[in-house]
Amino acid sequence: MNTPYLSIITVTYNAELVLGRTLESVAMQTYRGFVEHIIVDGASKDHTLELVRTYKQEHPEIAVTLVSEPDKGLYDAMNKGLKLAKGEFVSFLNAGDRLHDKMTLEDIFDNAEHPERIGVIYGDTNIVDNHGNYLRQRHLSAPEQLTWTSFQKGMLVCHQSFYARRTLCPPYDLQYRFSSDVDWCIRVMKAGEECGLTNLNMHSVLTDYLDGGMTLKNHRASLIERFRIMAHYYGLLPTIWNHFLFLFR
């Protein structure tokens, strides 16, 4: 079996207090395939860049790329990372997030049969606090079989637990400031379906996600964007109905 080559993209800005555990979670992986770690920094003014440079020096087995410059927001930075990525699969692991345990990547790729037939690999997500302590499992659970229509019921898979084949990945649509990841995941899955690729459910927690991200801080604006995205892909009336059902979930 060919070993998939993975690109992990991490976006940072003044993240010295939480970035360390993100970098450590990548460095401790038992996975023996080639991994590149692309870190896109928004011109941090704290010690974020020092942390990354030390990480790069101490872990030559990981191909670390650092870009630090002003950006136009999170999704602009993520697009910069996508342009640099060379891996067969791409994942996003932003500052404060971490791979769930040291076996995460090995479990994903060494146990995936025929990875060349896979469009997306996905799993569940734990929520952690600023100190990395477990708070709860994410409210929405990954469906048994994920398709592009699954997000009619909400974003059932956290972006950080969504590993996408790079050739399927479009740029993030910058018209969406808070929920472009929803639109992006749908487009990735639609493209995979058109290519006859399948999506693989790992049936395990892949990521510990830092509570209180940009979407939560801009909750109302994010909900409006998500409604627009869902109406675009699934139709206005089904989207209204599904949002009515959300009230009782």
Feature locations, PLM:
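Nucleotide-sugar donor-binding/catalytic module of glycosyltransferases
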Residues: M1-N218
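Membrane-interface aromatic/basic loop that binds lipid-linked glycans or pyrophosphate carriers
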Residues: M1-T3, R32, S44, I229-R249
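A sequence-level detector of short, solvent-exposed, charge-rich linear segments
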Residues: H100, L105, R187, A221, ...
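Catalytic core of nucleotide-sugar-dependent glycosyltransferases
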Residues: G192, S204-V205, L216-I240
